[in-house]
């Protein structure tokens, strides 16, 4: 549906689709995985009634910053992507978009995002600098550490902290439970993603948790998902959430079980489908959160 909506962009200019691919608007899974935990937190921070202004700011901010993250990622990987089957057709790797054009795109996206943050409050504005720093750092970590997914987890969890400061003007200690839960969840699902490229990454020297975990990959991913659910249960208790929230967690748990089963042979395509499937887990938790507040 999302891709159908943006396809008319390809008709605006002969190169328009190249930029759509650069910012991954044709692959919205990253938007969903960043959006759901941000919205969990916005709803919880606002006790179920987020300000419309903040809701619009964070939805648009998620889209813009995810796009910016894709640009900086492709810049960092431009000399590697051509050697990986899944990424060899990316616009920077093929030369359809120049490095200069990519940097201009990145700057525009970050500037637009910052303009949105300026509509919140000083605490949230200060936090936004950390968001840009962590998001920019992640792509380069794949050269130096087997834990780039942890950095990605921090980047994908930063919106949780900003949602609380935007709604409450402060950052309660309990918000860190949601932050840590989302970091662990991100490491889990991005490890599935990394499993699809593991053989290519080994050849070109790119590091990932999928390589680090080795034959214990599925066991460790399942453990991370279990810890994610445990932390969310603790967060639910601290924020006094009810039955609907926990039903959402139960659906997410079922999603995780399906992912473990479907990747039992470690087929790269099955691992990629398991990665995509996490969208439904995040959506289930969000719907459970919304329903819990709505039915009070």
Curated annotation (Swiss-Prot):
Gene3D superfamilies: UbiA prenyltransferase (1.20.120.1780). Pfam families: UbiA (PF01040). The keyword Magnesium applies. It is a multi-pass membrane protein. Its cofactor is Mg(2+). CDD domains: PT_UbiA_COQ2. It is an enzyme of class 2 (transferase). Pathway: Cofactor biosynthesis; ubiquinone biosynthesis. It is found in: Cell inner membrane. GO terms for molecular function: 4-hydroxybenzoate polyprenyltransferase activity. The chain crosses the membrane at residues 29-49, 55-75, 102-122, 146-166, 169-189, 219-239, 241-261, 275-295. GO terms for biological process: ubiquinone biosynthetic process. This is 4-hydroxybenzoate octaprenyltransferase. It comes from Pseudomonas aeruginosa (strain ATCC 15692 / DSM 22644 / CIP 104116 / JCM 14847 / LMG 12228 / 1C / PRS 101 / PAO1). The gene is ubiA.
């Amino acid at each position: 549906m999302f891709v159908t909506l943006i396809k008319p962009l390809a008709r605006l200019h002969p190169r328009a689709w190249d930029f759509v691919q650069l910012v991954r608007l044709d692959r919205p899974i990253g938007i969903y995985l960043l959006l759901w935990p941000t919205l969990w937190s916005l709803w919880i921070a606002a006790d179920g009634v987020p300000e419309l202004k903040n809701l619009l700011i964070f939805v648009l901010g998620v889209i813009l910053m995810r796009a910016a993250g894709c640009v900086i990622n492709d810049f960092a990987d431009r000399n590697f992507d051509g050697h990986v089957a899944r990424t060899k057709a990316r616009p920077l790797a093929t030369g359809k978009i120049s490095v200069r054009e990519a940097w201009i795109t990145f700057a525009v996206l970050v500037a637009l995002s910052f303009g949105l943050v300026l509509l919140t409050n000083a605490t949230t504005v200060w936090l936004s600098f950390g968001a840009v720093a962590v998001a920019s750092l992640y792509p380069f970590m794949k050269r130096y550490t087997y834990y780039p997914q942890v950095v990605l987890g921090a980047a994908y969890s930063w919106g949780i902290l900003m949602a609380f400061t935007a709604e409450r003007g402060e950052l309660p200690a309990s918000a860190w439970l949601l932050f840590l839960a989302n970091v662990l969840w991100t490491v889990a699902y991005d490890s599935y993603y990394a499993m699809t490229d593991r053989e290519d990454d080994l050849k070109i020297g790119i590091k990932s948790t999928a390589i680090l975990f080795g034959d214990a990959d599925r066991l460790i991913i399942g453990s991370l998902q279990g810890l994610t659910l445990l932390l969310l249960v603790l967060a639910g208790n601290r924020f006094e959430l009810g039955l609907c929230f926990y039903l959402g967690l139960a659906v997410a748990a079922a999603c995780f079980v399906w992912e473990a089963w479907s990747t039992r042979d470690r087929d790269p395509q099955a691992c990629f489908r398991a990665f995509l499937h996490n969208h439904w887990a995040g959506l289930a938790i969000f719907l459970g959160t919304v329903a819990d507040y709505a039915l009070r």
